[in-house]
């Protein structure tokens, strides 16, 4: 089952973070999960200072309950099939309209290729970020830049690091 695959997959990890607003199917929250008791103990100090006690992390009971249901539902075949098909449909429509997108499509998002979409914007003017902002201003489309800004500057030279992909 999908749940068994997910459980085994995460059994091999040391830890993970999750924004529950996306794949947890809730309106707020997130979590950190760790397989190392020593790191967990260190992390709890910061959790208490900034988020709330370790048993609820600043979330109320309703939101924690909704997150539990959302995580369960997000591993159901019908939900995943529908979501993946919706993403694929959107991607195919964009390709049909000539929009440069990264392929193959996944199940989480469609990534526009800013290097091909807006090649006239110089890289040092953050073309992927500019594209994301304009899509929001013009169409209300909420996205995020995965490119030069996310790559951050070189810690020693303080110069931009330009990744191959600007999405």
What residues fall within each predicted segment?
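Conserved PLP-enzyme active-site core in the AAT-like
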Residues: 1-99, 112, 122, 129
């Amino acid at each position: 089952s999908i749940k068994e695959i997910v459980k085994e997959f995460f059994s091999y990890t040391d830890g993970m973070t999750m924004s529950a607003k996306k794949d947890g199917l809730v309106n707020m929250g997130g979590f950190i999960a760790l397989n190392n008791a020593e790191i967990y103990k260190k992390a709890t100090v910061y959790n208490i200072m900034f988020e709330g006690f370790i048993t609820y992390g600043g979330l109320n009971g309703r939101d924690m309950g909704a997150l539990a249901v959302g995580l369960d539902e997000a591993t159901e075949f019908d939900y995943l099939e529908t979501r993946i098909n919706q993403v694929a449909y959107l991607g195919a429509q964009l390709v049909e309209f000539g929009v440069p997108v990264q392929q193959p499509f996944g199940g989480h998002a469609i990534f526009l290729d800013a290097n091909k979409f807006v090649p006239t914007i110089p890289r040092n003017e953050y073309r992927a970020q500019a594209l994301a902002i304009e899509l929001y201003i013009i169409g209300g489309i909420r996205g995020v830049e995965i490119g030069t800004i996310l790559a951050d500057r070189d810690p020693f030279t303080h110069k931009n690091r330009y990744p191959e992909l600007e999405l």
